[in-house]
C-alpha cells in the first residue's frame, strides 16, 4: 500500500475537522431523556465543560461502556450513559432541557455491511429458534468469551467472526448448533416508491460509498434543510432523504469536495401500497401535488413549457425521472412539493412560475342550515364550524375563555354549543371552537337563498387616523423600474416579505399590528399547514438583504387564521412584536365597508415578477388608479364582487405579478396611508388597460379586529 492511501485512511479514522463528525455514529431524539428505573444504577456525572454535542460524541464514541449521552441544550452539559432505550429497566421521557444521542449500532434494527458492529437486541434466529446466551456453553459448546469490545451480551444475535451472512447465534436446540438471525441490511430494510419523498430508512452512505453529512450540521457543507424547520421531511441524523423533490433520495456528503450525491436504494415492488395522493382536475388541494388538470399557463398568462422539452429552459423534471408525477404535455404540476402547481415558461427571461389561477378546492363542510341578514336572529341547532370542528359550549371556559356568555348577552340565546352571532358579526353566526389553536370560527351555515346581502355603504365624509400609516418620503423614484411591473423603487415600511423554510421570498404582506400580518390565502397550502421555519422579514428594501443589515427584522410565524369564506385573506400572528421605526411602520385599516372613491391614486408594493422591466433587488412601488366596480365589471363580465375592488394602471402596463401576492394596495387618505386592498392572483398580471382585482379590506375589518382581539 502506498503512502497516499495510508494517509487518506488515517485522516478518515482521526475525523479531520470539517469532514466526518463524531455525531455520525449517533441517532438523536430531541427533547428526550433516558431514565433507568433501578435506583441502584446511576448514570455518569454531568460534564459542564463541553462546547457542543459534537464534543460529547467525541468523548462517548471511543468508550466501550458509553452507549449514549444526554446533551443539555441550555447549559451545554454532557452526561455519558452506559445504556440505551433497549436496555432493561429503562424508559424514555420527554424533556425540555435535554437531547438524547444513542450509538446507532445499539438502536438500529438493520445492519450495515455484514453486521459486525450490530449491537441490537434481536435474540431469535431466522428459523424462529431462541438464541443461546453467549456466556453459556450448553447445549452448544463454543470458543467465544463475552467482553465489552466484542459485544457478546445476553443471547443477542452477533457476528463475531465476520460471517458474510450477517449476525447469527448458537441456538438452544441441541440439533441446530447455530443459525443466521436474518436481520436485513439497512439498504434492504426500506424501499423507495415514486421519488422517495417518504423514504425513512437508515442508509447513511451515498451510491459512491461516501458517508452522509448530518442534516443538523452545517459542515462541511452549508445548506437550508435544518431539521427544526422541516419537521415533516424526516431529516433524521445523516440518513438519505429527499426534502427538495429531487428524482430520488440523496444527502450532503462528508467530503468537502463533493456537496451532495444520490443514494443507492432499492425500488419498491408492485406489492407495496404507498400513500395514495388524492387527485383533482378542476381545483387543487394542499400544495397541489395531486392536481391532474389541464391548466397550461402561469398566473400571469404566460404559456408553459412542455415537461419533455429543454428549451427555452433546461431542467431535471423530465417525465421519465418523475414517472409518478404525471408530467404530461405542458400542464401545471407540482413535482417537487412547492407551494402550489407550477411550470417552466416559454418566456426565456422567466424560468418558472406558479399557476395560482387554478382555484383551491374548498375544505368547508356542507352547510347544514341557513340564516338571514347577519344571522343575529339565528336560533338553529347547528354546532359545527365551516371546517367541521365541534363548537365549544357557551358556558364553558375551556379550551377558550369566552367574552360572550348567556349572562352577558341574555337576548342572544347562547344555548348549549349552538352557533350564534352575539356581536353582530357581518360574516354570520360563529362559535368558540374545541380546537385549542382556533379561538373562534364561522359556522357550517349559508345565507338563505331568498335573502339579499346588504350592499356596501357610501363612504363616510371623514376618515381619521392617528398613529398608523405614516412614513418618510420614498426614495428617488427616477432610478429604475423594478419588480412590480412598471414600478419604481420606494419605501413601504408596512410591506413585509414572507419567507419559506429555505429563506426564499414567496409572498408579500402588510403589518397591521405589531404582532399581526395580513396577507392572501393563496400564499398557503392549507389553513392548518405547519408553520415551523416560516418567517416574516421587515425593515429592508432588498429582496436579498446583506447579512447583518441593521434595520432587518426577522420574526418567526407562530399562527395562521384564515378569513371568512370568500375573503381570500389570512392573518399571521408573529412569535413576538416587531420594533416600529422609520423602516417598520403600521398601516391603517379602513373603516368598515369603506369604499375608495373612483379616481383615487393608490400604490402597490412588492418584490414580485417584473416581466423583464427591472432588477431583482429592491422593493417596488407602483401607482394605480381606483375604478368603480361597475366599470371594472364591464371588462370582467360581472364577476367582480362587492368584497373586491379594482384598479387600472396609470402607465400601462403597471400592476402586480407573482411574488407580490398578499401585499398591500395602499391609498393616501386624510394624510394617512390606508390598507384598502390585498393583492390576489389575477388571470393576467399587469395587462394594459385591463383592471386588476383586489380583496376589499374594509369588508373584513370587523373580522380582522376580532381575530386580533381574541388572539
UniProtKB/Swiss-Prot annotation:
<feature type="domain" description="Kringle 3">
    <location>
        <begin position="283"/>
        <end position="361"/>
    </location>
</feature>
<feature type="domain" description="Kringle 2">
    <location>
        <begin position="191"/>
        <end position="268"/>
    </location>
</feature>
<keyword id="KW-0721">Serine protease homolog</keyword>
<dbReference type="GO" id="GO:0046425">
    <property type="term" value="P:regulation of receptor signaling pathway via JAK-STAT"/>
</dbReference>
<feature type="disulfide bond">
    <location>
        <begin position="212"/>
        <end position="251"/>
    </location>
</feature>
<keyword id="KW-0325">Glycoprotein</keyword>
<dbReference type="InterPro" id="IPR000001">
    <property type="entry name" value="Kringle"/>
</dbReference>
<feature type="glycosylation site" description="N-linked (GlcNAc...) asparagine">
    <location>
        <position position="296"/>
    </location>
</feature>
<dbReference type="GO" id="GO:0005576">
    <property type="term" value="C:extracellular region"/>
</dbReference>
<dbReference type="GO" id="GO:0062023">
    <property type="term" value="C:collagen-containing extracellular matrix"/>
</dbReference>
<keyword id="KW-0677">Repeat</keyword>
<feature type="domain" description="Peptidase S1">
    <location>
        <begin position="484"/>
        <end position="709"/>
    </location>
</feature>
<dbReference type="GO" id="GO:0005615">
    <property type="term" value="C:extracellular space"/>
</dbReference>
<feature type="disulfide bond">
    <location>
        <begin position="370"/>
        <end position="448"/>
    </location>
</feature>
<protein>
    <recommendedName>
        <fullName>Hepatocyte growth factor-like protein</fullName>
    </recommendedName>
</protein>
<dbReference type="InterPro" id="IPR043575">
    <property type="entry name" value="MSP_HGFL"/>
</dbReference>
<dbReference type="GO" id="GO:0006508">
    <property type="term" value="P:proteolysis"/>
</dbReference>
<feature type="disulfide bond">
    <location>
        <begin position="194"/>
        <end position="324"/>
    </location>
</feature>
<feature type="disulfide bond">
    <location>
        <begin position="632"/>
        <end position="646"/>
    </location>
</feature>
<feature type="disulfide bond">
    <location>
        <begin position="131"/>
        <end position="169"/>
    </location>
</feature>
<dbReference type="Pfam" id="PF00051">
    <property type="entry name" value="Kringle"/>
</dbReference>
<feature type="disulfide bond">
    <location>
        <begin position="304"/>
        <end position="343"/>
    </location>
</feature>
<feature type="disulfide bond">
    <location>
        <begin position="191"/>
        <end position="268"/>
    </location>
</feature>
<feature type="domain" description="PAN">
    <location>
        <begin position="21"/>
        <end position="105"/>
    </location>
</feature>
<comment type="similarity">
    <text>Belongs to the peptidase S1 family. Plasminogen subfamily.</text>
</comment>
<keyword id="KW-0964">Secreted</keyword>
<feature type="disulfide bond">
    <location>
        <begin position="602"/>
        <end position="667"/>
    </location>
</feature>
<feature type="disulfide bond">
    <location>
        <begin position="332"/>
        <end position="355"/>
    </location>
</feature>
<keyword id="KW-0420">Kringle</keyword>
<dbReference type="GO" id="GO:0045721">
    <property type="term" value="P:negative regulation of gluconeogenesis"/>
</dbReference>
<feature type="domain" description="Kringle 1">
    <location>
        <begin position="110"/>
        <end position="186"/>
    </location>
</feature>
<feature type="disulfide bond" description="Interchain (between alpha and beta chains)">
    <location>
        <begin position="468"/>
        <end position="588"/>
    </location>
</feature>
<dbReference type="InterPro" id="IPR043504">
    <property type="entry name" value="Peptidase_S1_PA_chymotrypsin"/>
</dbReference>
<feature type="disulfide bond">
    <location>
        <begin position="283"/>
        <end position="361"/>
    </location>
</feature>
<feature type="disulfide bond">
    <location>
        <begin position="391"/>
        <end position="431"/>
    </location>
</feature>
<dbReference type="InterPro" id="IPR001254">
    <property type="entry name" value="Trypsin_dom"/>
</dbReference>
<dbReference type="Pfam" id="PF00089">
    <property type="entry name" value="Trypsin"/>
</dbReference>
<keyword id="KW-0732">Signal</keyword>
<feature type="disulfide bond">
    <location>
        <begin position="110"/>
        <end position="186"/>
    </location>
</feature>
<feature type="disulfide bond">
    <location>
        <begin position="419"/>
        <end position="443"/>
    </location>
</feature>
<dbReference type="InterPro" id="IPR009003">
    <property type="entry name" value="Peptidase_S1_PA"/>
</dbReference>
<feature type="signal peptide">
    <location>
        <begin position="1"/>
        <end position="18"/>
    </location>
</feature>
Amino acid at each position: 500500500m502506498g503512502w497516499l492511501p495510508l494517509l487518506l485512511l488515517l485522516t478518515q479514522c482521526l475525523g479531520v475537522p470539517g469532514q466526518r463528525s463524531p455525531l455520525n455514529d449517533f441517532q438523536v431524539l430531541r427533547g428526550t431523556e433516558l431514565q433507568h428505573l433501578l435506583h441502584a444504577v446511576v448514570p455518569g456525572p454531568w460534564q459542564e465543560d463541553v462546547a457542543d454535542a459534537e464534543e460529547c460524541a467525541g468523548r462517548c464514541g471511543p468508550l466501550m461502556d458509553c452507549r449514549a449521552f444526554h446533551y443539555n441544550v441550555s447549559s451545554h452539559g454532557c452526561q455519558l450513559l452506559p445504556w440505551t432505550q433497549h436496555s432493561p429497566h429503562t424508559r424514555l421521557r420527554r424533556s425540555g432541557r435535554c437531547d438524547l444521542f444513542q450509538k446507532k449500532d445499539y438502536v438500529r434494527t438493520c445492519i450495515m455491511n455484514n453486521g459486525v458492529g450490530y449491537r441490537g437486541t434481536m435474540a431469535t434466529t431466522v428459523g424462529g429458534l431462541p438464541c443461546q446466551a453467549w456466556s453459556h456453553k450448553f447445549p452448544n459448546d463454543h470458543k467465544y468469551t463475552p467482553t465489552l469490545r466484542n459485544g457478546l451480551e445476553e443471547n443477542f444475535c452477533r457476528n463475531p467472526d465476520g460471517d458474510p451472512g450477517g449476525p447469527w447465534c448458537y441456538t438452544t436446540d441441541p440439533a441446530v448448533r447455530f443459525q443466521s438471525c436474518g436481520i436485513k441490511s439497512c439498504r434492504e430494510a426500506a424501499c423507495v416508491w415514486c421519488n422517495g419523498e417518504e423514504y425513512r430508512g437508515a442508509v447513511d452512505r451515498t451510491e459512491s460509498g461516501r458517508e452522509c453529512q448530518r442534516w443538523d450540521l452545517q459542515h462541511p457543507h452549508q445548506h437550508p434543510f435544518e431539521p427544526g424547520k422541516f419537521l415533516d421531511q424526516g431529516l433524521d441524523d445523516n440518513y438519505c432523504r429527499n426534502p427538495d423533490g429531487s428524482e430520488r433520495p440523496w444527502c450532503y456528503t462528508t467530503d468537502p469536495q463533493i456537496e451532495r450525491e444520490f443514494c443507492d436504494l432499492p425500488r419498491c415492488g408492485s406489492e407495496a401500497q404507498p400513500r395514495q395522493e388524492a387527485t383533482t382536475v378542476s381545483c387543487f388541494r394542499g400544495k397541489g401535488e395531486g392536481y391532474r388538470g389541464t391548466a397550461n399557463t402561469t398566473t400571469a398568462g404566460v404559456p408553459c413549457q412542455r415537461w419533455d422539452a429543454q428549451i427555452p429552459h433546461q431542467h431535471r423534471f423530465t417525465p421519465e425521472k418523475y414517472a409518478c408525477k404525471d408530467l404530461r404535455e405542458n400542464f401545471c404540476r407540482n413535482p417537487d412539493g412547492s407551494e402550489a402547481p407550477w411550470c417552466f415558461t416559454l418566456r426565456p427571461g422567466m424560468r418558472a412560475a406558479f399557476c395560482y389561477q387554478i382555484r383551491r378546492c374548498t375544505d368547508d363542510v356542507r352547510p347544514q342550515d341557513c340564516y338571514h341578514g347577519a344571522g343575529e336572529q339565528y336560533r338553529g341547532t347547528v354546532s359545527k364550524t365551516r371546517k367541521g370542528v365541534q363548537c365549544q359550549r357557551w358556558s364553558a371556559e375551556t379550551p377558550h375563555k369566552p367574552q360572550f356568555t348567556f349572562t352577558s348577552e341574555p337576548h342572544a340565546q347562547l344555548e348549549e354549543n349552538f352557533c350564534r352571532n352575539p356581536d353582530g358579526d357581518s360574516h354570520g353566526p360563529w362559535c368558540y371552537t374545541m380546537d385549542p389553536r382556533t379561538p373562534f370560527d364561522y359556522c357550517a351555515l349559508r345565507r338563505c337563498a331568498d335573502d339579499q346581502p346588504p350592499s356596501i355603504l357610501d363612504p363616510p365624509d371623514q376618515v381619521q387616523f392617528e398613529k398608523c400609516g405614516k412614513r418618510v418620503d420614498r426614495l428617488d423614484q427616477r432610478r429604475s423600474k423594478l419588480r412590480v411591473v412598471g414600478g419604481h423603487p420606494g419605501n413601504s415600511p408596512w410591506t413585509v416579505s414572507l419567507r419559506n423554510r429555505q429563506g426564499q421570498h414567496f409572498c408579500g404582506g402588510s403589518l397591521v399590528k405589531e404582532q399581526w400580518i395580513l396577507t392572501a390565502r393563496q400564499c398557503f397550502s392549507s389553513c392548518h399547514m405547519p408553520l415551523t421555519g416560516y418567517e416574516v422579514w421587515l425593515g429592508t428594501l432588498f429582496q436579498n438583504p446583506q447579512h447583518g443589515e441593521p434595520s432587518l427584522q426577522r420574526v418567526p410565524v407562530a399562527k395562521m387564521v384564515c378569513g371568512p369564506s370568500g375573503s381570500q385573506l389570512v392573518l399571521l400572528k408573529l412569535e413576538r412584536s416587531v420594533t416600529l421605526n422609520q423602516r417598520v411602520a403600521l398601516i391603517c385599516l379602513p373603516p368598515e365597508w369603506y369604499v375608495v372613491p373612483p379616481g383615487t391614486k393608490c400604490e402597490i408594493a412588492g418584490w414580485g415578477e417584473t416581466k423583464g422591466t427591472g432588477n431583482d433587488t429592491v422593493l417596488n412601488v407602483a401607482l394605480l388608479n381606483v375604478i368603480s366596480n361597475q366599470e371594472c365589471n364591464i371588462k370582467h363580465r360581472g364577476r367582480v364582487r362587492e368584497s373586491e375592488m379594482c384598479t387600472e394602471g396609470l402607465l400601462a402596463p403597471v400592476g402586480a405579478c407573482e411574488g407580490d401576492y398578499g401585499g398591500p394596495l395602499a391609498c393616501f387618505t386624510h394624510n394617512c396611508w390606508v390598507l384598502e386592498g390585498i393583492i390576489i392572483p389575477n388571470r393576467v398580471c399587469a395587462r394594459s388597460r385591463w383592471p386588476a382585482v383586489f380583496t376589499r379590506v374594509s369588508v373584513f375589518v370587523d373580522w380582522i379586529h376580532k381575530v386580533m382581539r381574541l388572539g
